[in-house]
Amino acid sequence: MKLTFTVTYLTPAGKETKTTVEIGIADFAAWERKSKRKVQDLQAGMGIDDMTFLCWHRITKNKIDARDYETWLESVQQIEAEGVEAAHPTAPAPSDDN
């Protein structure tokens, strides 16, 4: 599964910036370690802390912002979900076994 979010936040200098991030496997694994929950739990609903942590993790991995999570979170102005891509968006290719 891949999620895409657009996050508007303030830089350390106070400038508003908008960043679009694609959340992938490494981000979900980090979220599982932090939250002590499984990614399947997100199917029941995703909270603000879930979304912002996933975005922060990707932003820091992409070296866009180096602040710790709590400091960065205080600067977030808005978060928008852009899309969800399934883990297997197409049907499997035919094989000799089918």
Segments (PLM) and residue ranges:
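Flexible glycine-rich active-site/ligand-binding loops centered on an Asp-His dyad
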Residues: 22-25
